[in-house]
Amino acid sequence: MVLDPIINGYHLTRVLMDGGSGLNLIYQDTVRKMGIDRTKIRHRTTTFKGVVPGLEARCTGSLLLEVVFGSSDNFRSERLTFYIAPFRSGDQALLGRTAFARFNAIPHYASLKLKMPGPCGTITVSGNTECSLRAEEHAAALAAEH
């Protein structure tokens, strides 16, 4: 499901929520475009397996970033650790199981909705159908390259 949260003050439009992933990833290109100070990157040696078919990659560090879902009158904010992925993707970031757990979020894949508790009731975030299809096509093209 492709969503558009605010991450570290930036409204991102292609963030994949993937309940099958054990990590939150942010891609090097996204970090560069967000202008994040390189001194905030923590050294990590985490290895990714299964993110890109047939490849194994080592992250280039990690960042603690604030993620916000909802509207100005009913929102949730959580600080999540993101591992910096050294490869390309059609997405700007990937939120895994830890994000689902921290936000107490429940995905509804058939209707492309993500629901979570907020201070003023349930927050419902709609997924972007067009972006979801494009992201899937892009991932398939990247897999075919390798």
Question: What would you call each of these model-derived segments?
Answer:
Residues 1-12:
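A short acidic-Thr-Gly-centered motif at the start of a beta-strand
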Residues 15-17:
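Short hydrophobic beta-strand that contains or immediately precedes a catalytic carboxylate
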Residues 19, 23-146:
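Aspartic protease core domain of the pepsin/retropepsin superfamily
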